[in-house]
Amino acid sequence: MSRRIIVGTLQRTQRNMNSGISQVFQRELTCPICMNYFIDPVTIDCGHSFCRPCFYLNWQDIPILTQCFECIKTIQQRNLKTNIRLKKMASLARKASLWLFLSSEEQMCGIHRETKKMFCEVDRSLLCLLCSSSQEHRYHRHCPAEWAAEEHWEKLLKKMQSLWEKACENQRNLNVETTRISHWKAFGDILYRSESVLLHMPQPLNLALRAGPITGLRDRLNQF
């Protein structure tokens, strides 16, 4: 076997290995609920990780005890802390995925044939460096594309956190109203039973009737 064939075979094997490692790496950084790279990941008691917003927003009744989405083990939903290392790795993976997307032929600047690295905050569009300094965009605000992407995810996280807080508040209000209605219903049942008992109790004899004469009773007794 020639040296060229051996080298080619080794290169293909290396590419396949890298591809396999990349897929495993990507899978480990993907939330099993939203199937995207983690946003503010939290690791629960059983060891599995989820995006914090995904974890919170998938419980309608907001129980204290619940089950893991993957292993179905009962877990505590308290004091969830961000997995900092996993968050950083997911952020790097998002940036790498973004650069892979921007480097594709479809996303190259049609005028200058350069990668669109800049984001125009006015036009909300991706531009290459030359386009961002052109007359049309010169006075617009620009930032690197990865900054814009991370800012987008942070805003999304805040919105989802706000939704979760509102859901918690609504659930608390609902619990208060449910308890109040239950108490009023119990009070109404007590009143109903009390009224029923009073209606079936024997009524006392009217003293005025018992003290008065019964007309004709003596005459009837004398007939015997």
UniProtKB/Swiss-Prot annotation:
Under Gene Ontology molecular function, one entry of this record is: ubiquitin protein ligase activity
EC code(s) of this entry: 2.3.2.27
In terms of superkingdom, the source organism counts as: Eukaryota
- Where are the RING-type-classified zinc fingers? 31-72
User: SMART domains attached here?
Assistant: BBOX, RING
Query: CDD domains from the entry?
Result: Bbox2_TRIM43-like, RING-HC_TRIM43-like_C-IV
Annotated keywords: Cytoplasm, Metal-binding, Transferase, Ubl conjugation pathway, Zinc, Zinc-finger
- Where does this polypeptide localize? Cytoplasm, Cytosol
* PROSITE patterns the record matches: ZF_BBOX, ZF_RING_2
Annotated residues for binding of Zn(2+): C109, H112, C131, H137
Catalytic activity, reaction form: S-ubiquitinyl-[E2 ubiquitin-conjugating enzyme]-L-cysteine + [acceptor protein]-L-lysine = [E2 ubiquitin-conjugating enzyme]-L-cysteine + N(6)-ubiquitinyl-[acceptor protein]-L-lysine
* One annotated Gene Ontology cellular component of this protein: cytoplasm
Report the stretches of sequence that form zinc fingers (B box-type).
104-145
Q: Which GO terms describe its biological process?
A: innate immune response; regulation of gene expression
Key word Cytoplasm present in the record?
Answer: yes
Function, in words:
E3 ubiquitin-protein ligase which promotes K48-linked polyubiquitination of protein methyltransferase PRMT1, leading to PRMT1 degradation. This suppresses methylation of the PRMT1 substrate MAP3K5/ASK1, promoting its activation and increasing MAP3K5-dependent cell death induced by oxidative stress. TRIM48-mediated ubiquitination of PRMT1 also suppresses methylation of FOXO1 by PRMT1, leading to inhibition of FOXO1 transcriptional activity.
PANTHER family associated with the record: E3 UBIQUITIN-PROTEIN LIGASE TRIM
Q: How does it assemble?
A: Interacts with PRMT1; the interaction leads to ubiquitination of PRMT1 by TRIM48. Interacts with MAP3K5. Interacts with STRAP.
Similarity comment: family membership: Belongs to the TRIM/RBCC family.
Q: What is this protein called?
A: E3 ubiquitin-protein ligase TRIM48
Could you read off the lineage of the organism from its UniProt record?
Eukaryota, Metazoa, Chordata, Craniata, Vertebrata
